[in-house]
Amino acid sequence: SEKFDAIYTIYGEGDTNSNPSAYQIGTNNIHLYASNDLQEWTRIASLKQGNIYTYAIEQGNWQYRYIKLVDLSENSSLSEIGFLKEDHTGFLPISILRDKQKDGPYPGSLLIDEQDKLVLSPTYYDQAYFDEIYHVRNAWEIANGQYMYANVHPLLGTNIIALSIRLFGMNPLSWRLPGAIAGVLMLPVLYGILKLLFKRNDLSLIGSFLLAADFMHITTSRIATLEPFSILFILCSFYWMFKYCMSSFYTLPMQKGIIYLLLSGIFMGISISAKWTGCYAAVGLAIMLFTNWIQRYLEYKK
């Protein structure tokens, strides 16, 4: 028998097409039993709250030779399992003794075939964080033609993350890169808006710096969420609306004004296709537009 004091489990990329009638939600209800003689079994852990791409670590103090997994839910899914050595220097070497699915498409050996990839002290550089457990999962499913777990939001932002996964592989850097780029692109767009409003470079730079230093901007742009994409396109739509509203009624050619409004509308639609919050921004655009038309009409009547 071997001593171990932690059980590491993780659910990563899998085949969600294998059971489309049930959501695969990680270690939903898996019991672990242990024995030293294959006769008497003791339940040592119950895995109930594991999320996709995140480690679930059960702490304890055990000394057993055999481990048995009993799955009580068709929603459960598990990609890899490891048993931390008592001295915390690595994981115990393990092998499969009995497997009812040995000749099936998902043998038990798949649970221990990537022991070298398990992380002793996982951080958010190694696993999903916050809503990444939803968006990254959907992106991976899109990138690989899998049955989708959820479609709460429009899928443009998720498809952008999926494209990055296809290009650079399934890893935290890959799924976080598009949002970081979108966060950077917000700065020149905001600078352009402020330049239209204040006509001053210094104030525009100060406003852009405040956005760059904003905690919420940094937080959402460094993880794989949909906010950076939606907000980037919202800012673009407002830039063109400001461009239209701040132009002179007498000097702005009608064709040019139509182009401004068209670009604003296009970016508005793109923002909504990234996340439903773009709809709220659309209300603001409508208020700006109709207010401007009323002002122009009153100016014309004079």
Predicted region positions:
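Aromatic, loop-rich ligand-recognition surfaces of beta-strand-rich domains
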Residues: S1-Y124
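Extracytoplasmic catalytic/substrate-binding loops of multi-pass membrane glycan-assembly enzymes
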Residues: Q101-V136, M148-I160, M170-L173
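Juxtamembrane segments of multi-pass membrane glycosylation machinery
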Residues: A143-Y149, I160-I181, R200, F215-M216
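Transmembrane-helix motifs of polytopic, lipid-linked glycan transferases
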Residues: L173, L177-F198, C236-W240
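Short acidic/glycine- and proline-prone juxtamembrane loop motifs at membrane-interface regions
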Residues: W175, G179, M216-F229, T277
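Transmembrane-helix signature of polytopic, membrane-embedded enzymes
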Residues: L190-A213, L232, F249-K256
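Membrane-interface transmembrane helices that cradle and orient dolichyl/undecaprenyl
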Residues: F198, S237-Y260, S271, W293-Y300
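Transmembrane-embedded, aromatic-rich helix segments that form part
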Residues: L262-L263, T277-Q295
